[in-house]
Amino acid sequence: MGKVVGIDLGTTNSEVAVMQGGEPVVIPSAEGSTLIPSVVAINKNGERIVGRQAKNQAILNPENTVYSIKRFMGRKWGEPAGRELPVEADAKRKPYKVIQGNNNEVRVVMGDKDFSPPEVSAMILQKLKSDAEAYLGEKVTEAVITVPAYFNDAQRQATKDAGAIAGLKVLRIINEPTAAALAYGLDKKKDETIAVYDLGGGTFDISILELGEGTFQVKSTAGDTHLGGDDFDQKIIDWLIAEYKKDQGIDLSKDKTALQRLKEAAEKAKIELSTVQQTEINLPFITADASGPKHLNIILTRSKLEQMVMDLVEKSLEPCRQALKDSGKTSAEINEVILVGGQTRMPLVQQKVKDFFGKEPNKGVNPDEVVAIGAAIQAGVLKGEVSDVLLLDVIPLTLGIETLGGVSTALITRNTTIPTSKSQVFSTAADNQPSVEIHVLQGERPMAADNRTLGRFMLDGILPAPRGVPQIEVTFDIDANGMLSVKAKDKGTGREQKITITASSGLSKEEVEKMTREAEAHAAEDTKRKEEIEARNVADNLAYNAEKTLRDNKDKIPAELNTELESKIAAVRTALQGNDVEAIKKTTQELSTALQSVGSAVYGKQQEGAPAQEEPSAEGKKADDEGTVEGEFREV
């Protein structure tokens, strides 16, 4: 049986690792480095090149050299990414061409062809696969691939697609901070709580985990799929462009070759400023005008760089606050803070993390290699090479469906351990309703309209029946990859329908933060709206039952009670026309009391001419009703 490799498919760099002799080993590339640039190009001869070779020729071939493709994985043209940054705006920063394909898909152009992001990622994976096969001396067909914890379903599916295109069966998609925790904690004997702060080239994740006796349990996770080293580089690039325009009057942002040179210079300067206080950015012949060639020569200090990127570092701390809150932990309860990702080498990042958690971050792991090592360990677990390790990951957002009145009814709450399955029984909202629409939602708000739609599907063939009678069982299943499937089943007919959510547009970190902030800011308003809808549902249902009771028992109800019940029903219907929740509750209570009187009168008449019968127990009644929630589904 062949080896299963662990792959860290990064925005800036990628790595591949494998278990050998019970230990994880990072595999060097054909060029001798364990870090393989996530860069793909087609050169002037039409040859496809990947990795270090592609990066080295980027300045001479900027339009046909693609990097940071991970930021376009699972994305749609026109869809927001990050803080009000649509794909189009992100594309404008790249020297290569990004175009709109069918169904608003993102495509990138190299040579005379255009490619989807999974295709480009597959080229990187093929390079990793080839290097691993050369190192191991055998074919590699299976892999565990890491993704940011906050990757949505579409992004995870795009990653699996890339693996398939590269000829790899992806046995598991594993979250990057969780992989890092595996690498850190594999040989640890004591129980501890750790925070994994993962700031990579394009994404940011923070996870809180509990480690003990071989179990790695994620307590909470938060992050931003559009925050990373690329953004730090862009700050320097923007500054260089502005300074040069101020000094020379020339706008370098319009020159693709100059842009590529600026990107490389920015990345180099940023890395140097992690160990020195200032660096000189020297780019001869950056451009030319009528007077001749122009050069760029600027001094950048660490202090200036820190001023430029302070907002980005601060931006990473809000998810840390959210993760701590969701985990129920305080910073004092965190035993170790693990730094992951090359951007965490920046002194400012390390200082801010230290200030936030109140302790020195653990620097005992290689931030570039730890994720690939964790992926290899998970591969070893799946193949039985690593024993006594249990990994328990979570979902980042609440999942549910829309029910009566536009309410979002949660089935699986955020930070629930996966894999998991949850079922709940709902019913129809109208008499003789022949079909229902299942509206699958993602988000923390009480109202469906305030959450994100993941998908919709129909369940047809429901037999004619009064509302509330059909039993529709809705089941949510989330697999170990964090991918969701939803099934609806009519318990009466056995008819069922299901959908796998693999192409949802998902959420950026900013959207999640916005949802959370709105949920807190509008908590009182949301509660009031939800109470009103619940009160309306109870009132409408009671009035419906009262009207049915009148129709079915007209000859058994005394005239005075009949008149009183009609009056109370009318009062409820009138209250439902207005917006006074207290009036709705008051008339509902009065109708309930009147309905009880009618019931007593009807049963009293029956008992006069018949032997007493044992009344069903309260427990029996509860058992009959338990688990049924009235749901609103669209009538077709």
From Swiss-Prot:
<comment type="function">
    <text>Acts as a chaperone.</text>
</comment>
<dbReference type="InterPro" id="IPR013126">
    <property type="entry name" value="Hsp_70_fam"/>
</dbReference>
<dbReference type="InterPro" id="IPR012725">
    <property type="entry name" value="Chaperone_DnaK"/>
</dbReference>
<keyword id="KW-0597">Phosphoprotein</keyword>
<comment type="similarity">
    <text>Belongs to the heat shock protein 70 family.</text>
</comment>
<dbReference type="GO" id="GO:0051082">
    <property type="term" value="F:unfolded protein binding"/>
</dbReference>
<keyword id="KW-0067">ATP-binding</keyword>
<dbReference type="InterPro" id="IPR029048">
    <property type="entry name" value="HSP70_C_sf"/>
</dbReference>
<keyword id="KW-0547">Nucleotide-binding</keyword>
<feature type="region of interest" description="Disordered">
    <location>
        <begin position="602"/>
        <end position="636"/>
    </location>
</feature>
<dbReference type="Pfam" id="PF00012">
    <property type="entry name" value="HSP70"/>
</dbReference>
<dbReference type="InterPro" id="IPR029047">
    <property type="entry name" value="HSP70_peptide-bd_sf"/>
</dbReference>
<keyword id="KW-0143">Chaperone</keyword>
<dbReference type="InterPro" id="IPR043129">
    <property type="entry name" value="ATPase_NBD"/>
</dbReference>
<dbReference type="GO" id="GO:0140662">
    <property type="term" value="F:ATP-dependent protein folding chaperone"/>
</dbReference>
<protein>
    <recommendedName>
        <fullName>Chaperone protein DnaK</fullName>
    </recommendedName>
</protein>
<keyword id="KW-0346">Stress response</keyword>
<feature type="modified residue" description="Phosphothreonine; by autocatalysis">
    <location>
        <position position="203"/>
    </location>
</feature>
<feature type="compositionally biased region" description="Basic and acidic residues">
    <location>
        <begin position="618"/>
        <end position="636"/>
    </location>
</feature>
<dbReference type="InterPro" id="IPR018181">
    <property type="entry name" value="Heat_shock_70_CS"/>
</dbReference>
<dbReference type="GO" id="GO:0005524">
    <property type="term" value="F:ATP binding"/>
</dbReference>
